[in-house]
């Protein structure tokens, strides 16, 4: 069934019911995995520019921007989604060069391309630009125009960065919204040990649509982390409830990387009260949300069969950390309406996937840099329906239900056959960015036990596995040579 998900986006459009109103548009949720700028100042060592081969650099930032824009161009005949909720933009740790007027910024650099800015025209001012400005400029260069930009107001802790003590300040990222609709208002809500929750209200042909972008505390199955996520969820729930108290039919989309499974209560029962399902109230009964008013939240993962619910991998299993939830107002005939059954995972085989299992092709700084993200984006369609009846509801053809399994899906490693896995050759190591994340059959001889290494085609390669039993098994083989 995955092929149906892929085909929808490779064609640049979804199979949709007949249009009911003037305009349809796409809302994309995209964790771009560490989109860091070119100033060389970074919370993560992997993104500090050291000059070493595997170091981050302006040239690798350019590759990363190019790959992000490639994904965005698969929408709307190359024009990009109308609304994008981004995760993992770097907080600007060189705040001496802010961009407060994006129109003025684009005008200033209209005679240069980002490719020139990050190469032959690179200077200290360009190095200091925040990533949202560089991405906006790249979009303009490629003809994806008309975006307004809002970012979270997360402040960099420069003293903690200088001290190198990441236990003091671990926040490296902020959230962002790029919108082709006018921005009416934005707020940035601080929440414990996580990125600020970004709230953006957009003017959709005269009607307000509020988008919340989240990136909660990591480690989905960890009880201590779940305690923090409960606080993250409370920040969001309280703010959403204040909006709904003023208008029970308010159109609200809640999106982002929640570092929780959509069925967190079933997958991790040891956590007790969960942030996503119990505090925030994410649930899978679409009909209940469609006929309700107020606080009900339908999680769009339930639009897909259970075997198609995946956005990321960990430990040989699929996860659903990327989420999109909607309020009852998006099922009425006033303002903005969800296009039923339009939710999909953005899988572009061979581009944002790797290997025979089509796992996410995560970003790597190896070689020239390559990959896209360790998360697949997720998308859904919406439409404007004018000043219709708030009491009238969308007729659901196949409403989502609470059919979630109690275990995560296996990615399918056990299904691979030998002829699906190529043999490793020394030539593969010469282009690590291209081959990072692929599966290979390795035939060689153990050349070192500590550190563990293998010789293939006359070249030595270090071996590592998170599986201690496998490491010990490899060390039990006799060293040759």
Each model region followed by its residue ranges:
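Structural recognition of the beta-strand scaffold that forms the well-ordered cores
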Residues: 26-29, 82-88, 148-151, 175-179, ...
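Beta-strand-turn-beta hairpins that frame and shape the catalytic cleft
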Residues: 22-27, 36, 181-185, 194-218
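Metal-dependent phosphoester-hydrolase catalytic domains
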Residues: 188-192, 242-252, 260-425
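Bacterial N-terminal signal peptides
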Residues: 7-17
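OB-fold nucleic-acid-binding modules
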Residues: 300, 389-481
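Second-shell loop/turn segments in exported
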Residues: 50-61, 117-126, 162-165, 188, ...
């Amino acid at each position: 069934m995955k092929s149906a998900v892929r085909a929808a986006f490779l064609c640049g459009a979804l199979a949709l019911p007949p249009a009911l109103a003037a305009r349809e548009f796409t809302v994309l949720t995209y964790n771009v995995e560490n989109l860091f700028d070119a100033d060389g100042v970074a919370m993560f060592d992997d993104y500090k520019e050291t000059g070493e081969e595997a170091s981050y650099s302006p040239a690798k930032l350019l590759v990363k921007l190019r790959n992000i824009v490639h994904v965005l161009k698969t929408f709307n005949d190359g024009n990009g989604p109308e609304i994008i909720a981004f995760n993992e933009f770097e907080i600007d740790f060189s705040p001496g060069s802010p961009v407060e007027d994006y129109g003025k910024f684009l005008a200033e650099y209209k005679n240069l391309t980002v490719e020139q800015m990050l190469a032959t025209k690179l200077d200290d001012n360009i190095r200091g630009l925040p990533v949202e400005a560089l991405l906006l400029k790249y979009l303009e260069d490629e003809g994806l125009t008309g975006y307004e930009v809002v970012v979270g107001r997360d402040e960099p802790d420069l003293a903690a960065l200088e001290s190198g003590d990441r236990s003091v300040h671990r926040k490296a990222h902020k959230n962002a919204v790029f919108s082709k609709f006018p921005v009416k208002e934005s707020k940035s809500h601080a929440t414990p040990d996580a990125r600020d929750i970004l709230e953006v209200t957009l003017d959709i042909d005269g009607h307000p649509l509020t988008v919340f972008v989240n990136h909660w505390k990591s480690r989905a199955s960890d009880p201590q982390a779940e305690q923090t996520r409960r606080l993250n969820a409370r920040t969001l729930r309280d703010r959403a409830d204040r909006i709904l108290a003023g208008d029970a039919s308010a159109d609200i989309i809640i999106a982002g990387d929640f570092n929780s499974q959509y069925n967190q209560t079933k997958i991790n029962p040891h956590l007790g009260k969960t942030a996503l399902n119990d505090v925030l109230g994410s649930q899978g009964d679409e009909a209940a949300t469609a006929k309700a008013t107020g606080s009900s939240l339908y999680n769009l993962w339930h639009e897909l069969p259970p075997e198609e619910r995946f956005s990321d991998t960990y430990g040989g299993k699929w996860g659903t950390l990327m989420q999109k939830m909607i309020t009852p107002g998006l099922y009425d005939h006033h303002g903005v309406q969800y296009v039923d059954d339009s939710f999909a995972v953005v899988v572009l085989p061979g581009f944002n996937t790797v290997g025979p299992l089509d796992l996410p092709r995560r970003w790597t700084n190896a070689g020239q840099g390559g990959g896209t993200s360790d998360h697949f984006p997720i998308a859904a369609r919406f439409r404007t329906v004018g000043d219709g009846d708030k009491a009238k509801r969308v007729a659901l053809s196949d409403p989502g239900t609470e059919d979630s399994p109690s275990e995560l899906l296996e990615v399918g490693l056990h299904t691979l056959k030998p002829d699906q896995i190529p043999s490793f050759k020394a030539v593969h190591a010469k282009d690590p960015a291209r081959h990072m994340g692929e599966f290979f059959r390795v035939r060689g001889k153990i050349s070192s036990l500590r550190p563990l290494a293998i010789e293939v085609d006359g070249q030595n390669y270090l071996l590592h596995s998170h599986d201690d039993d496998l490491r010990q098994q490899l060390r039990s083989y006799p060293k040759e040579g």
